[in-house]
Structures are given as C-alpha cells and as structure tokens.
A protein has these predicted regions:
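C-terminal substrate-binding subdomain of Rossmann-fold SDR/epimerase-dehydratase oxidoreductases
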Residues: 4, 8, 15-17, 56, ...
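A glycine/serine/threonine-rich, flexible loop-to-helix segment
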Residues: 125, 181-189
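N-terminal Rossmann-like NAD(P)+-binding domain of SDR-like oxidoreductases, especially those catalyzing
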Residues: 1-174, 216, 222, 273, ...
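Short, conserved catalytic or interaction motifs in soluble domains
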Residues: 36, 177, 238
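Short, solvent-exposed loop/turn segments at secondary-structure boundaries
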Residues: 83-84, 178-183
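Hydrophobic alpha-helix immediately C-terminal to the catalytic Tyr-X-X-X-Lys motif of short-chain
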Residues: 150, 154, 158, 190, ...
Length: 313
C-alpha cells in the first residue's frame, strides 16, 4: 500500500484531501503542528488503521517513510500569515527545503500547493501560467506571495538537479465546508457575519472581482496532478469571476436577505481582479470544476448552520 504524507493536513484543503485518500483506501500520515486547522477531525481519523498523526513542525527535520508527499503546510489566510510574516517566509523557504530533502531521500513523488498570489497584481485576465508576476516586496502580503515563489524555485531546482517528480499547483480562491469563521477569508467572513445577523464587511466599493472554486473540485484536480507526468506550474481554480459586492449580496440573500453591508477602507495592496486561465489544466489533466458557486455556497452554508446548531445550549 502506498504511503501518503500530508503536511498541514488539519488545514482546510488538507483535511478534505485526507478524507478523500482515506475513502480511496490509501494510507495517510498527517504532519501538523496545530497552528491552525481543525483538530476535531483527529478523533474520527485516529480510529482508522490507515491513518497516522505526527505532531511536528516542517521547520524541524523528520524521519518519515512515504511514497507521495502532499506539501500543504503554510499559513494560508491573511490573518494567519500577517500575524507573523517572518515565520511565514521561513515556513515557505526552510520548511519546503526540509521536505524536498526528505522527499529526495525517499525517492517520493511530490505535489506542492502554491498560490495565485505569485502572479501579484496582474492586469492580464485570465492569468496564465507563463505570466511572470509582479509582487511588491514592501506589501504586507508579500511574505506569503514571495514565500511561495521561492518555494516554487526550490521545487524546480530539486526537479532539475535530482530528477525528482515534483508538481506545482497554483491554487486560486477555494471555499467549502470546514472554512474557519475566524480565518479572514471573504466567503467565511460573509457567511459568519450573515449567520450572526451583522452587516457584511466589504472592502472598498466591492467592485473588485475574484473567482471561487469548491474544495472537492480542487481535490479532484490535485489527485489527477499527482498521478500525471506534468512538471510545470498549473492553475487550479474556477474561472467564473464575481464582484465582491455581488458575492456579499448572494450570500446575504441565501441566509437572511437583510441587505446590510459595511463598506471598509481598502488596503493599498488590494488586487483588483483575479481569475485563472484553465486552458492548460483542461489539456493536461482533462479537468474542469463541476460545482457552481451557488450550489457550493448552499453546501457550505448548510454545514455552518449545522455546526452552529451543535454549539447552541
């Protein structure tokens, strides 16, 4: 049986990946340091003989046997990585370097989850993989964007020098059941605010656009990518754009229809538009997202409602 090592497996995407791999009957080792994510899943997974949890930090060196490495460990929400930008940069550089050396020693295949933020404030829409990107090193978010860029560089260096099988997924905005209300991502913010009957916080005029991909679609793509021979970066996401104000209205209408919005001053590094080109991933992996935004939001909202109901006395 193949052994999968998932770093950051208690995080949002990592937990969904673990669920899928366990469902598929694969052996999973989760390495996580409890810095974020959902510890509650451990009680369920620990009962499975094909699951093992290791408490640890990727900044430390480990001796773990595995055939496939899924490297997801990194602060991924703005609140997390802005809390300690230096640590965020170190995790991306030192942590990724440790894991690359470990994968090299194990002769393992690897998927590294990068981010759409490597493109920076890009005027080219949709964003294609060969766009070199522009990220201002002075911006607060650069610890994350540049951290992922240097991690990608390390992946390519190991790929060339040691002939390793390393795949790089540039993941765009992802949502679904299990998003933490406090993590600062726009969909979790809006759902949490609407469920608590408070005005939805919109930065700027809300005309900036994003595209959102349902998490199970992303998991489908990651599995296809791991099993492919493709070696270049590849976009994973949904190309359908929506303005932030329209997203707020959509979520508000699905919950209470209060139409209460609080417009906040936007930050200087706010990206005006973000949407992936999916041409390459369709050609290489024969993949495209299947869950539309409205249906995915229904599933996410229902999950949050059930969670709130359990917390009520």
């Amino acid at each position: 049986m193949k052994r999968n090592l998932i770093t950051g497996g208690l995080g949002f995407i990592g937990s969904h990946l673990i669920e899928r791999l366990i469902y598929l009957g694969e052996y999973v080792v989760c390495l996580d340091n409890f810095s974020s994510g959902n510890k509650g899943n451990l009680a369920k997974w620990n009962k499975n003989p094909n699951f093992k949890f290791i408490y640890g930090d990727i900044l430390d060196k480990h001796e773990i046997k595995f055939d496939k490495l899924w490297h997801l460990a990194c602060p991924a929400s703005p609140k997390e990585y802005l809390k300690d930008p230096i640590l965020t940069a170190r995790i991306n550089f030192e942590g990724t370097l440790n894991l690359l050396n470990l994968a090299k020693d194990q002769k393992a295949k690897m998927v590294f989850t990068s981010t759409s933020e490597v493109y920076g404030n890009c005027d080219q829409i949709p964003q294609v993989e060969n766009f070199l990107g522009f990220v201002n090193t002075k911006n607060l978010r650069s610890c994350y964007a540049h951290g992922k860029r240097i991690a990608e560089t390390l992946c390519f260096d190991f790929q060339r020098k040691y002939k390793m099988e390393i795949k790089i997924a540039r993941i765009f905005n992802t949502y679904g059941p299990g998003l933490r209300p406090e993590d600062g991502r726009v969909i979790s913010n809006f759902i949490n605010q609407a469920l608590n009957n408070v005005p939805l916080s919109v930065f700027g005029d809300g005309k900036q656009t994003r595209s959102f991909c349902y998490v199970e679609d992303i998991i489908d793509a990651l599995l296809l990518l791991m099993n492919s021979n493709f070696k270049d970066p590849i976009n994973l996401g949904n190309s359908n754009e929506i303005s932030i104000i329209d997203l707020a209205k959509l979520i508000d209408n699905k919950i209470y229809a209060n139409k209460q919005f609080s417009f906040m001053k936007s930050t200087n590094d706010e990206i005006s538009r973000r949407s992936p080109s999916l041409k390459l991933v369709k050609e290489v992996l024969n993949w495209q997202p299947r869950v539309d935004l409205s249906d995915g939001l229904d599933l996410t909202i229902e999950f949050e409602k059930k969670k709130l109901k359990k917390l009520q006395p």
